Amino acid sequence: MLVLDKKTFEEEVLKTKGYVLVDYFGDGCVPCEALMPDVE
């Protein structure tokens, strides 16, 4: 799993050939925290 920012998003996601799963996460987001074990 990668942690991306504005500088690396285009290179790692938009320019990658193939499929990419992007998970948007926010600190303190209860549904986000509930999904983490499954996504990771």
Swiss-Prot record:
It comes from Clostridium sporogenes. Keywords: Disulfide bond, Electron transport, Redox-active center, Transport. Disulfide bonds join 29-32. InterPro entries: Thioredoxin-like_sf, Thioredoxin_CS, Thioredoxin_domain. Participates in various redox reactions through the reversible oxidation of its active center dithiol to a disulfide and catalyzes dithiol-disulfide exchange reactions. The gene is trxA. Gene3D superfamilies: Glutaredoxin. PROSITE patterns: THIOREDOXIN_1. The lineage of its organism: Bacteria, Bacillati, Bacillota, Clostridia, Eubacteriales. This is Thioredoxin. Belongs to the thioredoxin family.
